[in-house]
Amino acid sequence: AEFGGGVKVGLNLTLADGNLVVASGHGIDFSATSGSGTSELLDDYEEGTFTPALSHNGGSSVSIAVGAATGTYVKVGRLVTVTFNLNVTPSYSSAPTYWLIQGFPFAVNVGIGSILGYNNNNAASFAGRTETGGNNALFFATLASGTAANTFWTASYETDS
């Protein structure tokens, strides 16, 4: 059945089978709550995969051999959370100033996102931040030249996409 004026349900709405489909440009309205936010409309949800990459700033004769590079993401509204694995072996004659993780699935809105990582090969932890306007994050850490780093990461950031 199709109703042009809307349907009001007094108690609960249960779908016995199938999906709840919301038309493009609309979402779930939480305005009945007493929050003071600027938007109470949940209008975006997405999950998927991406391929992260490692780059650098500074240093000399830097090269990066990449083994595994796999990532997943969940986007709810403007908040993106990524988790990924990078298995890399950097080589250099002088160390880079910092390392860049690139290839995030959505552009970073503001530089307030954070990233945490762990090197499974030597139990080292990393922390960093996202970069405004790009699809990347930077971190300051020592990745030993010629030594494999099997790293695991998670990051959360805001996007306008």
Language-model features: locations:
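Intrinsic low-complexity, repeat-rich intrinsically disordered segments enriched
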Residues: A1-G59, T83, P90, Y118
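Generic beta-strand structural signal
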Residues: L15, K75, T130-T132
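Beta-strand-connecting loop/turn residues
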Residues: G18, H26, R78, N135-N136
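Surface-exposed ligand/attachment interfaces on beta-rich extracellular proteins
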Residues: A32-L41, T49-V76, N85-V108, T142-A149
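Residue-level detector of buried hydrophobic side-chain packing
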Residues: V80-V82, F104, A155
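Extracellular attachment/recognition segments
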Residues: G103-F140
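Short, structured beta-strand segments at or near domain termini in extracellular proteins/domains
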Residues: A149-S161
